[in-house]
A protein has these predicted regions:
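Long, low-complexity intrinsically disordered regions enriched in Ser/Thr/Asp/Glu with frequent Gly/Pro
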Residues: 244-247, 279-415
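Short, isolated positions in well-ordered beta-strands
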Residues: 30-32, 44-46, 204, 307-310, ...
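Beta-strand-rich assembly/attachment modules of structural machines
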Residues: 1-165
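C-terminal extracytoplasmic interaction modules
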Residues: 2, 40-42, 49-51, 57-67, ...
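Short aromatic-centered micro-motifs
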Residues: 22-24, 37, 197, 301, ...
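Local beta-strand/beta-hairpin segments that build beta-sheet-rich folds
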Residues: 32, 114-117, 308, 496-503
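Short solvent-exposed strand/turn elements
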Residues: 128-153, 380, 659-680
C-alpha cells in the first residue's frame, strides 16, 4: 500500500476521502463518509452530505494550532440519527476524522491514513426533515478549561470515588497517576493497598464532603486527605506584656472563600491567602495557604514587608517571629502542631494535597487586629519529567516551559496516550540549553535559553495560559499524522527542519534546512498553485496597516537577576517610528518570563516579526498540502512579486471538502529573528540594587523607641536586608532610557 504523501504528488490520484468514526457514550461506533466504502473491517455509510473543517490557525484563541471545530451534515430522512439522540444521545461522543486515498472502482484503499481531527461531539446543532447536523470541538479547545481548578472552601473539594472502578483508580491514580480525578481523595477501603475504612464490611459509596464524613471514612486522621479549610481557632483569654487580660483577636479570613488555590510554576514572589490569624497577647499566629502541591521549597517570607526568618528549634525567636513549612503539599496532609485541643490532639485542618505555612510574628509587626500582608518567594510545583525516548524519569521541580505546558495539559484532562512525549522532551532539551548573557552588573554568565516562572491565583482559561507561555518561549503545538499532540520550537529552518519529511517535494536544502513544501508558479516547469476560473494564479500578497503593526512593545516579568523583583521592559523600533511618524504600542501577551535577558530576546523577536515580517501570502493548492501544519516553513516561487524560494511560515490552513483543495496563508520568514543574540542588550543597562543599603535586623519586641518603618531591600551582594521605605521603593525601577541597539541595520531602543 502506498503512502498518502507519495500519492498526493501524482498528477492523477485516487479519490481523497475523509472518514468519520464516532463512538457514542454506550460504546456504539458509527462510521460515515461521503461515499459508501469498506475500510479496516468497517462499512462507512454514505451519510455525509457536507462537512466543514474550520481553518487551522497559528496562535489561535484555543491555544493550540489544530482544527478547532468540525461541523457535519448527514442524511436523516429515515430519522436514524434522531432515534440515536433519543435512545443514547450524541453529547459527549468522541469523533475521529481520518484521511485516505480510495479507489472507488476496486473498492479498496490505496494509501495509509492520517488523523485530521479528534474531538468531542456537542448536542445536535439542528435536525430537519432531511438533514441532521452535528458539531464537535477539538480535544485541545482549551477555552473550556479553567485554571486553577480548585476553589478554597469549607467542604472538601476532592471527588469521592463512589464505585469499584473509581476506587481502583483512587489507589494510585491508575493510568492518570496524580492527575486522576480520584487521586487526591484516594478512598479505596476495599482495594489492596487502599486507604479508608468500611461500614459493616462494605465500602462507602458516597460522601457529604464534610469533616465529619471524612472522619467516618477514615480519611481525616489516617491518610489526612481532607482538603477543606474550615478550622477557626477559638478566642481565648490572653495577657500581653504590660497589659491586662483580654480575649485574643481571631480573624477568620472569610474573603478567601470561593477564591482559588494558587498554582505556582518555577520561582516567583506572590501574595498567598491567609486562612486565619490569632493573637496570643504577644505574638500573632497565622496559617498561610501556599497552593497546590507538592511544591519544592519556600525561600523567603515577608510580613508587612519585613523579612521573617525560618523557625529554628531551641531558639527564642519572639523578637523576630518565625515561619515553618508545615506541608509542601503531599497527597497525605499534615496537621499544624501549633493547633491542638486541650488533650493535645490536632485541631486544625490537614491540607491534603495543599502546601501551607505556619507564620508567627510579634505584635510590632502585626497585633492581630487586622490581617497583615504576607509575601512569599517560593519554588513551585514538582512536575513529571520524561526522557528523550518518552520514558518517565522522575517528578521534580523545574522551570522548563515544556514540562509546565505538559502539566497544564494533564490538569486539563489530557492523557499520556494522546501526547507525543518525545517531542516534549526534545523541546525541553532545547529550552534547557545554556546560552551566554550578562547579569545586571555586566558579568558574563550562562543561563537556560527559556524558562517560565508563573503564579496563577485568579482563574483564567487554559487557552490564554498556553498561548502566554508559548509566546514567552517560542513554542507551538501541532498534531502528528497518528493524532498525537506534539510540542515544537519555532526556530530557524536549519534547527526546526533539519531533515526532509515524507510529505515534502523539496529536492535541495535551504539555509541548512529542508522546506516542508515548495510552491511554484510554473516558471521552473513545476506548478502546484491552483489558478482561478479566469486563469490567474490564486496568489494574494497582503500586509497589515500601520495601526496593526506595533513598533513599541512592553512586557512585565519578575527578574530572577534582581531577586525576582517585579519589573518591565519596553522595546521600540526607532527606524519604524521615524518612517511612520507614529508610536504604536502594545503589551506582549507573554507569561512567565523569568529574567531581563529572555524578555529582551522575546521582545526583539516579536518586533522583527511584526515589522520586518509584515508580508503575508495566501495561495490555494490541491491535496498536495496534506501533512502541512501551522508553524511549518515552506518556500514560494512567484516571480511577479520577486519571490524565488522565499521562505514563509504557515500561519493558517483552511482545508476544503475531502481535502481536495486547501487555502494556505503564510508569513515571510527570516532566520536571523531566531538567533540567541537577537534582542540581547548589555546586562549593566538593567536595574541594579540601590547603593547604600545594608543588612540589619528587625526592631526587638520591646525597648526601642525608634518608630521608623523598615522594609526589606536588597544589598549590593543580593542579600535581603533592611532599608528605609523611601529608598527601597526604587529598587525595581529601571534606570535605562533611550539606550539604542543596532541589530541587522535597524535601530532599536529599550527602556524600563
Amino acid at each position: 500500500m502506498s503512502s498518502i504523501y507519495d500519492l498526493k504528488e501524482q498528477a492523477v490520484t485516487d479519490t481523497p476521502l475523509l472518514l468519520f468514526n464516532c463512538v457514542l457514550q454506550n460504546g456504539q461506533s458509527e462510521y460515515w463518509s461521503t461515499h459508501q466504502i469498506s475500510y479496516g473491517g468497517n462499512t462507512y455509510a454514505p451519510r455525509v452530505i457536507k462537512h466543514n473543517l474550520i481553518e487551522v490557525q497559528a496562535a489561535s484563541d484555543q491555544g493550540v494550532d489544530v482544527i478547532p471545530r468540525v461541523s457535519v451534515s448527514m442524511a436523516n430522512a429515515d430519522s436514524y440519527f434522531s432515534e440515536l439522540e433519543r435512545s443514547v444521545g450524541w453529547k459527549g461522543a468522541t469523533l475521529t476524522v481520518t484521511f485516505l486515498f480510495y479507489d472507488l472502482l476496486t473498492s479498496a484503499a490505496t494509501s495509509d491514513t492520517a488523523v485530521i481531527f479528534q474531538g468531542i461531539v456537542n448536542s445536535p446543532d439542528q435536525s430537519t426533515e432531511s438533514l441532521f447536523q452535528l458539531s464537535a470541538i477539538n480535544l485541545m479547545n482549551m477555552q473550556r478549561v479553567l485554571l486553577p481548578p480548585v476553589r478554597i472552601q469549607r467542604r472538601c473539594p476532592w471527588l469521592f470515588p463512589g464505585n469499584i472502578q473509581q476506587r481502583q483508580d483512587a489507589v494510585s491514580g491508575g493510568n492518570s497517576g496524580q492527575y486522576s480525578l480520584y487521586y487526591p481523595c484516594g478512598y479505596s477501603a476495599d482495594q489492596a493497598g487502599g486507604a479508608g475504612t468500611m461500614v459493616g464490611g462494605v465500602p462507602y459509596t458516597s460522601c457529604g464532603y464534610t469533616r465529619t464524613d471524612c472522619e467516618a471514612r477514615g480519611m481525616f486522621t489516617g491518610p489526612k486527605r481532607f482538603g477543606g479549610l474550615e478550622f477557626v481557632p477559638s478566642s481565648i483569654q490572653v495577657r500581653g506584656y504590660g497589659t491586662g487580660w483580654q480575649y485574643a483577636p481571631v480573624d477568620d479570613n472569610v474573603a478567601i472563600y470561593n477564591d482559588f488555590v494558587p498554582l505556582l510554576y518555577g520561582t516567583a514572589w506572590y501574595y498567598p491567602p491567609i486562612v486565619f490569624s490569632r493573637n496570643d497577647g504577644n505574638l500573632t499566629h497565622m496559617e498561610v495557604l501556599l497552593g497546590m502541591g507538592p511544591i519544592q521549597d519556600v525561600r523567603m517570607v515577608l510580613v508587612n514587608q519585613i523579612q521573617i526568618p525560618l523557625g529554628q528549634s531551641g531558639k527564642n525567636m519572639t523578637s523576630t517571629g518565625w515561619y515553618n513549612v508545615v506541608s509542601l503539599g503531599s497527597r497525605n496532609g499534615v496537621f499544624n502542631p501549633d493547633c491542638v485541643d486541650a488533650s493535645g490532639n490536632p485541631a486544625g485542618d490537614p491540607y491534603g494535597s495543599m502546601a501551607y505555612l505556619s507564620v508567627v510574628v510579634p505584635n510590632q509587626i502585626n497585633n492581630g487586629q487586622s490581617l497583615p500582608t504576607v509575601q512569599v518567594l517560593a519554588d513551585g510545583l514538582q512536575v513529571p519529567i520524561y526522557g528523550s525516548d518518552g520514558s518517565y524519569q522522575n517528578t521534580a521541580f523545574t522551570a522548563n516551559p515544556a514540562w509546565i505546558l505538559l502539566d497544564i495539559l494533564r490538569r486539563s484532562g489530557w492523557s499520556m496516550a494522546n501526547v507525543d512525549i518525545a517531542s516534549f522532551a526534545a523541546a525541553s532539551a532545547f529550552c534547557d540549553q545554556q546560552i551566554q548573557t550578562q547579569d545586571l552588573s555586566g558579568n558574563s554568565i550562562m543561563i537556560p535559553r527559556f524558562q517560565c516562572n508563573l503564579c496563577l491565583q485568579h482563574r483564567r482559561n487554559a487557552g490564554d495560559l498556553i498561548r502566554g507561555i508559548r509566546n514567552g518561549s517560542r513554542l507551538l503545538f501541532t498534531y502528528s499524522t497518528s493524532g498525537l499532540l506534539q510540542l515544537q520550537v519555532e526556530n530557524s529552518i536549519a534547527l526546526q527542519q533539519p531533515s526532509q519529511v515524507a510529505w515534502s517535494n523539496s529536492t535541495e536544502t535551504l539555509n541548512g534546512g529542508w522546506p516542508y513544501y515548495e510552491f511554484e508558479d510554473g516558471s521552473t516547469s513545476t506548478a502546484n498553485i491552483l489558478r482561478k476560473a479566469n486563469g490567474e494564479p490564486s496568489v494574494v500578497v497582503t500586509s497589515r496597516s500601520i495601526v496593526d503593526t506595533p513598533n513599541q512593545l512592553t512586557v512585565e516579568f519578575q527578574d530572577a537577576f534582581n531577586s525576582y523583583q517585579q519589573d518591565s521592559l519596553l522595546m521600540v523600533d526607532v527606524d519604524d517610528i521615524d518612517l511612520t511618524g507614529q508610536v504604536i504600542t502594545t503589551s506582549l501577551m507573554a507569561l512567565g518570563i523569568p529574567n531581563y535577558d529572555q524578555a529582551a530576546r522575546i521582545l526583539g523577536y516579536t518586533l522583527d516579526r511584526a515589522i520586518q515580517g509584515n508580508t503575508y501570502i495566501t495561495l490555494e493548492t490541491s491535496v498536495k498540502a496534506l501533512g502541512l501544519r501551522p508553524g511549518d516553513l515552506i518556500t514560494v516561487t512567484y516571480l511577479k512579486e520577486g519571490f524565488e524560494r522565499q521562505p514563509f511560515r504557515i500561519v493558517k490552513i483552511a482545508p476544503g471538502s475531502n481535502y481536495r483543495t486547501t487555502k494556505i496563508t503564510g508569513q515571510i520568514h527570516q532566520d536571523s529573528w531566531y538567533e540567541d543574540t537577537n534582542g540581547q542588550m548589555p546586562g549593566n543597562t538593567g536595574a541594579r540594587p540601590q547603593p547604600g543599603s545594608a543588612v540589619g535586623v528587625p526592631h526587638p519586641l520591646l525597648g526601642n523607641t525608634n518608630r521608623h518603618e523598615w522594609r526589606a531591600a536588597i544589598s549590593d551582594h543580593g542579600e535581603f536586608g533592611q532599608c528605609q521605605r523611601r529608598r527601597c521603593n526604587r529598587t525595581a525601577q529601571r534606570g535605562i532610557l533611550g539606550s539604542v541597539q543596532h541589530t541587522g541595520g535597524r535601530a532599536r531602543g529599550a527602556t524600563g
